[in-house]
Amino acid sequence: MKQRYAMGYLCFFLIIPLMAGDDNMARKANYQLAGRFAPYKIKKLLYSTSINPKWIEGTENFWYEWETSEGKTFYVVDPIRGKKEQIFDNDKIAAELTRISLDPWDAQHLPIEKIKFIDKNTLQFDVKSSQDDKGEEVIEEEIDEQKWDLDKKEKEKEKEKIYKKKVFHFEYKINTQKLRELKDWEAPDKHPKWANVSPDGETIVFARNHNLYMINASDYKKILDAGRGKDGKKAVDAIEKVTVNERQLTRDGEEYYSYAVFDRGDTDDKRKRDKGKRKRTRIYWAKDSKKFASIRSDQRKSKDLWVVHSVKNKRPKLETYKYDMAGDKNVTQYEIDIHDLATQSILNLDIKKFKDQRIGVYSGRQFRYPDSDKPQQTVWLAEDSKKFYFYRQSRDMHKVDVCVADTETGDVKVLFEEKLNTYVELQRLELLKSGDMLWWSERDGWGHIYHYGKNGKLKQQITSGPFSVRRIMGIDESKQTIYFMANGREENEDPYLQHLYSVFIDGTRMKLLNEGNFDHRTSMGESNRFFVNNYSLVNTLPKSALYNTSGKKMADLQEADLSQLMAAGFQYPEPFQVKSADGVTDIYGVMTKPFDFDPQKKYPIVAYVYPGPQTEAV
């Protein structure tokens, strides 16, 4: 399958027609017609085309918003009952919001923002008023970067004071349709980007001046309280003023051999101004919060690259950063340290094998609820802090070792390896409760799932055949079932179309879960019991439906509203299939004809190919 992907997917565009009978006389290009379908114009004619389900924690339910030419509507879905219902009576809620906010709203233009479910029947949301809130502090617009060279007096002139718009906070009960203004509303926690919070919430790690530091939960609460309800520079300034007890964890960090994550896009001037401030760092927590691993990059011998920022600046600003290129003798070197919080010790793992190797750490699968105020955490792939899984990859990307490290002794063991004469493509490692592992590989020419024992010995190939598994979507160990996306398996279909499948861990009972000659994109809930299926082709109306993971359709949910687009004269592209130059290989593509296409005329063709692989490596 790799060869098929490398050839890419073709898009053919028919452009300026040639008059029949005279190939040398081209008709004038119809730019006006093409301009009608410029992206910024199409955007105004398109509404919702797929459902992005917001799963509600503690339930199987989810909610979503859907926009048509009639306006925006909000729905909540109960997958167990296979029922969807409108959250609001749009006319009624518009009238109530008008009464409270004194701004005129109607059913087609609801101002509802930032919906957050508290439980399956209770949600909160915001409505922004048209009026300034004179009781709030004003926002001082951040000074553009090019203005930092001005003197203090000139800087003050550059500041613009802008009042915040008043925001109303509401709570709504779905079962009773009761709306209540939350006059005592308090802003939720807003976690700074630099904060790496442990799974138990007791330790927060960050970088400062290239080294690692930590604070405890009580000090972190002071920081959250200081930044509560504030945005941008005001939040940063308020947080910086809080006095907390920082404990330094490392002392050997330096520029280009740092524990901090280098922020691309920062100019040299901004980097100087931010020196000494808290920074993000790349760490992975153990699930029990006793240890964490840090990834450190040594770029001291790597060469510089430069970008000049000139679009937003009156004067160009320079950004200097390290960048490895093909053929460079000295490139970035990586190392992994294990930090023990109880003993304050650091264990440097001996991970060296391939010259100029790359490394990656395997993290555990986590389900993120959109309404959660919890900080995002990266937890390493293990049930405790005793083991640590990672991979190392040769510079030419032809060899990969999947390894496990003992975090007490530092011993590193190769569990299994991948070798190919072409590049080895990687996906996540899945760890079962037994300690066994699921691994995705293209070793037989197709992407498939393999089952390894905890000792690294291959037990069996789970999926096989002339099709490609794209990715594992979920694992239900209680049912010994894997859910995955794949393409190329169904006969008489474009092999690029994706479907959702299930298979037992022992390789039996593989089942297609969303039939239909369409490209399917799915979103599964945390329990792996239900999924939303968005499906279409380039020449069909996008639709969405609810399924259970036995493959039963529970409900049709939505069809996209393309009425305005079609009324403007839009026409679907046309899929096609042809043989390549070898006369054997099938090529699949899409042809887009001019909207005033005349079959009696001749048209030159523009062939657009997007070849692979899409990867950046040296």
Outline where the language-model segments fall.
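Beta-propeller folds
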Residues: A20-P542, L546-Y547, S563, F570
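Residues at the start of alpha-helices and the adjacent loop-to-helix junctions
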Residues: Y9-F12, A26, A581
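Bacterial N-terminal signal peptides that target proteins for export
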Residues: M1-Y9
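Hydrophobic h-region of N-terminal signal peptides that target proteins for export
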Residues: F12-A20
